[in-house]
Amino acid sequence: MTVQELCAKEGVNLCYFDGSNWHSPGFFNPALNILALDINLSVEDQKQVDLHELGHKEHTPVQYELNRELCELQADRSMIHHLLEEELKLMDDIRDFNYLHFMEKYSLKTIANETMVKDEFNSLIS
């Protein structure tokens, strides 16, 4: 699914910006229901950022202010879940899935990411 299709499915407006001098590749503004993506990102990176930012859709500004780390982890988990779902649909045999290759492909580098990939994989195959 493209970023346009993902946003349409979630009922979120999509816009692009030049993120050359911006601190983030994308953001979700709940007050305006807009997801903004850096136009300079590759299509693959835009999709990854889009999935992460859509993971913030249910977060309120107060939740984010009080528990930013938790909200970021939840958004990462949501992104990982959707990327894994797509990846597994493309595989002939899910027994060939290698979580390290998946993590490398999407530049997932933390122990928290590794745990999420394993958890979401097990959740999706059971």
Question: Each predicted region: which residue ranges?
Answer:
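Active-site hotspot residues in diverse enzymes, especially metal/ion-binding acidic/histidine motifs
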Residues: 1-126
